Regions:
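S-adenosyl-L-methionine
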Residues: 1-41
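Class I S-adenosyl-L-methionine
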Residues: 33, 39, 51-189
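Glycine-rich, N-terminal phosphate-binding loop of Rossmann-like dinucleotide-binding domains
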Residues: 47-48
């Protein structure tokens, strides 16, 4: 499903090329609007921001509740998507990361169920599974984020602007979340 005809045409070509026409059907659709509950046992949503993805999951709630697995790859705001996944009664079962064309990507797999332990804010933002797996690509991402926050904190510490103090507190909170996740790489070594 896609909202635009161009990407849908590309998908159709790939489906034909890989001889999957008997297994895959394409539809022009805004999110899951053209999908009926129970029609799909797996849902993949990728290549868009987390706000839009969260909204698609909410609008397609009935379809989501009838599926057995979702694979989600938000380009931004992964915390909003993870929170929505939990709100819908799914748990995150796996995470994968890659680095391509100068950008880090994370995808996560979800299945119906409740997390054994609730997520904290750091885990909503940065995930729980990749740091636990000590994923080397994701570690580089976290180190890059740590360096960005360190520079921002240094700049804000030197600033005399009234808004700098509030921004500094936010940057320090964000740094603590990053360090929490990086700490998982040091555990059990």
């Amino acid at each position: 499903m896609d909202l635009r005809e161009g990407p849908l045409s590309s998908a159709k070509e790939n489906i034909r090329f890989f001889h999957q026409g008997q297994k895959i059907e394409t539809r022009l659709s805004d999110g899951m609007d053209e999908l009926k509950p129970g029609e799909a046992d797996r849902i993949v949503i990728a290549g868009m921001g987390g706000i839009l993805m969260r909204d698609i999951l909410e609008r397609g709630r009935e379809c989501v509740l009838h599926c057995g697995q979702m694979v989600l790859q938000p380009q931004s705001d992964p915390d909003l998507v993870r929170k929505k996944v939990h709100e819908l009664g799914f748990r995150i079962t796996d995470e994968r990361s890659c680095f391509e064309d100068g950008k880090y990507y994370v995808a996560f797999s979800c299945e119906p169920g409740i997390e054994e332990h609730p997520y904290n804010e750091a885990e909503y933002l940065y995930g729980r599974i990749l740091p636990a797996k000590k994923d080397p690509v994701y570690r580089k991402f976290l180190k890059t984020e740590e360096q960005k926050r360190a520079k921002l904190i240094e700049t804000l510490t030197k600033s005399d602007k009234p808004s700098a103090k509030e921004r500094l507190e936010g940057a320090q909170e964000e740094m603590n979340r990053i360090l929490f996740c990086l700490g998982k790489y040091k555990e059990e070594e």
